[in-house]
Amino acid sequence: MRKLLALLTLLAAPAWAENTAQETSFWAMEVQSGDLPPIAERLPEVPLVVDMEAKGRSFGTQGGTLRTLVSRTKDVRQMVVYGYARLVGYAPDYSLYPDILRDFEVFEDRRYVLHLRPGHKWSDGHPFTSEDFRYWWENVVNNDEITPTGPPDFMFVDGNLGSVTFPDAHTVVFEWPTPNSNFLPLLAQASPPFIYRPAHYLRQFHLDFAETESLAEEVRRARVKSWAALHNKRDNLYKFDNPALPTLQPWINASGRSSRQLFVRNPYYHRIDARGVQLPYIDVVEMTIVSAGLIAAKANAGEVDLQARGLDFPDISILKKGESDGGDYRTLLWANGAASQIAIYPNLNFRDPVWREVMRDVRFRRALSMGIDRRMINRALYFGLAHEGGMTALSSSPLHDPADLTSWATLDVKRANALLDEMGLTGRTPAGIRKLADGRPMEFVIETAGERQEVENALAIVTDTWRELGIKLIMRPLDRDILRNRVYAGVSMAAIWFGWDNGLPTPATSPKYLAPTNQEFFAWPKWGQYYQTSGSAGEAPDMKDPKRLMQLADDWSHTFDPAQRSVIWREMLDIHADQQYAIGILSEAPQPVVVSKQMRNVPETGIWAFEPGAHFGIHRIDEFYYENPLQQVTQ
């Protein structure tokens, strides 16, 4: 059946004849000079043909430059997120379809046969074949120097390592002894495991292929310690920071100044429309790096053509005013897919043993949650338009339970104080601050990424109500990367961030992210490290309910009954709501999306979510175009 669905997706595409392929004007000179082959030779034998009419979209005109902003140099990786070329991808209804793949076959949810598109090429024109998967498998993840930890955890099911075979140039087979039903959704993620590599490019940095003396010279010039470090530095399809690394994304990194990155259309991209016009429609993406605090102002000033990253609900008023004052843009309001707009994460792996014991007591976490005036925060920061409550599945998810949203989430200072008293935290300083068991004042430090004014404003309100509990809140803004590293190391007492990326789960969604399987869940970084490294780092979970979450996640992977999976999901969500590992404050506040008035095929409504959906990715940014692209050129 899964094979049939994949093939039907292919057959439903509109007919296309190779001789109708239209050459893009952007690469016309290179084609005329012989530096590039003509369009018919650059496309796969069977390209992915987009049916614009079926999607309710219009055919576009090639050309123009899309301007967007990011706040950090490393955010060039957003081009891989937005571009969203994946082996399989999510459609807007969250069904999976073959994208880079021509099709796929699934047998018993444990054997996956991936069929590549004959004639598909990397951005430098080299064939994309099963050899690129072989290189990843044999020469990267199974090379002890490049990957000391061995194959990634998704290749193991029930402790058994899967196999990867390569029957021919256009077929790759992944197989496990038992079902691995999360394999395809994993490939469709915003930040997927890239299970292929441009072997023809990377071999020059690999000891098994490169000439020893020339490789040693490359290592010296790159100022790294080993050939493996050099290989890893050159090889990152997600970071997108090596312009020489071939890609399959719609745009390729053309470098540029450090503060202004340029990306130009991939001449070998595999998607076309029914007229034979190669996507993406837009020729160039100009990504400018600015201070996070300037993004809204620059959007208001008309310096972007497409922007949502770096914009928050409080920016809507200034954006709408600029629009009404004659700005050449529209401000769309999309839904937000994160499980919580703002969530506080007490670190259960904090290295201070006294504080760690306090935070591991569920009464403390419940008291913190009941000491938050969510209604005041909603009215003050979101004009009452957000949903007040804890972190759980959003209202549009079939797994949403209103009881989980409200669990321990109603302001009740009296009850919160009673819980803290029950813990024995009855001693007070002259200023009324409770004392820890060792006599220290209860000063609760929450570290932030310092990027969102709404977070700091919310914490200012929380400070006042927590003071009534005898808890002094101290806010510490940090750089995002420093914050993450402190949390992972166990030196951060608590952090504030969004809720789960995926607030829209279905029973078919893997619930692993609700269990201690990843250090990126700030409540249990050490437990996540333990799972991710198979016990070589971090700490094993040593609390009852987190262990139960691990068991439930494992149970989910061993059943394929939707009803049973739903039962598992609901128990896991109930545990989170009851235990308050992450203390959600608000959710579902509208996400502003600034769009040039000249841009077409942009959805009026959508969901802004990293996972699933890759932000703009699921909405196919390669199909966006300008009404008059000649007016949209880079300066």
Predicted features along the sequence, with ranges:
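Short, well-ordered beta-strand elements
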Residues: 63-72, 102, 111-115, 136, ...
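Detector for C-terminal structural segments
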Residues: 245, 251, 255-261, 265, ...
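Extracellular/periplasmic solute-recognition and catalytic clefts
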Residues: 140, 145-150, 164-165, 252-268, ...
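Surface-exposed binding/hinge segments that line
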Residues: 153-230
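Ligand-site clamp/hinge motif
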Residues: 117, 238-242, 268-320, 366, ...
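A structural "hinge/loop" feature
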Residues: 53-81, 100, 183-192, 355-357, ...
